[in-house]
Design a protein with these regions (language model features):
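Conserved nucleotide-sensing/catalytic segment adjacent to the nucleotide-binding pocket
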Residues: 1-40, 73
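Short, flexible, glycine/charge-rich loop motifs used to bind or transfer phosphoryl groups or to couple energy/partner
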Residues: 7-8, 86-88
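NTP-dependent small-molecule kinase module
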Residues: 88-137
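A glycine- and Lys/Arg-enriched "phosphate-lid" helix/loop adjacent to the NTP-binding pocket
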Residues: 40-86
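Short, glycine/charged-enriched secondary-structure capping and boundary segments
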Residues: 32-35, 58-61, 113-114
Length: 137
């Protein structure tokens, strides 16, 4: 709640800002639309992992380093919802978006990018297809 209030305050003040989300909820759609109505250019950077198990491993690593835990079933649910919402709700409304594969040890790799509902380039067709296919399951 505190973060949402801060985001509303920054929006009202016309400040530039960024926030992190799994996209597992639809609640940011209205926020994006409100921001755009106020003249904001909304950029979405989506850091994708090919499986929910990789997300579970990342959380386990974070916990071993003193971070907070998230139950595996919650991670799986957020993972599925986030991927489904990515191209059905969020990329169609964001002014610019990029999807990155964040699973490689040598850094992130661009998968695709676009402007609203127009895909400008699919850099990694195999990964992009995995994302699209996951939504259909």
């Amino acid at each position: 709640r505190l973060m949402l209030q801060r985001m509303d305050d920054l929006l009202s003040e016309g400040e530039d800002f960024a926030f992190e989300t799994t996209l597992a909820t639809r609640s940011y759609v209205k926020f994006v639309e409100r921001a755009q109505a106020k003249g904001y250019f909304v950029t979405l950077l989506y850091f994708w992992l090919p499986t929910p198990e990789q997300a579970i491993e990342r959380v386990a690593t974070r916990v071993s380093e003193g971070g907070h835990n998230i139950p595996s079933d919650v991670i799986r649910q957020r993972y599925a919802n986030g991927i489904r919402n990515l191209t059905t709700l969020y990329t169609p409304i964001c002014d610019y978006w990029t999807i990155y594969d964040n699973s490689a040890a040598d850094g992130i790799h661009k998968v695709a990018w676009g402007v609203k509902d127009e895909i400008k380039e699919i850099v990694d067709p195999l990964s992009y297809q995995k994302i699209v296919d996951y939504e259909r399951d």
